[in-house]
Amino acid sequence: MTKTFSAKPADVTHEWFVIDATDKVLGRVASEVALRLRGKHKAIYTPHVDTGDFIVIINAAQLRVTGAKPIDKVYYRHSGYPGGITATNFRDMQAKHPGRALEKAVKGMLPKGPLGYAMIKKLKVYGGAEHPHTAQQPKVLEL
């Protein structure tokens, strides 16, 4: 009788990957990144163990969306006070905080709870081409 394999946290190795997001579509990048942060691309994937890799995304300022979404896609946040809701569209979000739209998209695709919060911490997003993770020797990942 064979038993189902269950990965142990000590046995999992987390690799580093770098993705160039220049002229890539937001949703397609986000879904691939979420899959790799969870570790579903690995044979040792276990739902309750963090088996995912570290992902560094560069050039997030050049990320794009299709159609009329630069103006029509709206992000909401609320201060907690009555009437304290603010809305920002994708174009303004990219101009002010490049990469935040990608972070929000990926975060929505990850599980909610302690494991999901640990997974989102492995995502590093930078608007430009430079990143401070060269010491980890990230491998280039083509999407």
From Swiss-Prot:
One of its GO terms (molecular function) is structural constituent of ribosome. The keyword Ubl conjugation does not apply. Gene3D superfamilies: Ribosomal protein L13 (3.90.1180.10). GO terms for biological process: negative regulation of translation; translation. One of its GO terms (cellular component) is cytosolic large ribosomal subunit. Transmembrane segments: none annotated. HAMAP family: Ribosomal_uL13. This protein is one of the early assembly proteins of the 50S ribosomal subunit, although it is not seen to bind rRNA by itself. It is important during the early stages of 50S assembly. Belongs to the universal ribosomal protein uL13 family. This is Large ribosomal subunit protein uL13. The lineage of its organism: Bacteria, Pseudomonadati, Pseudomonadota, Betaproteobacteria, Burkholderiales.
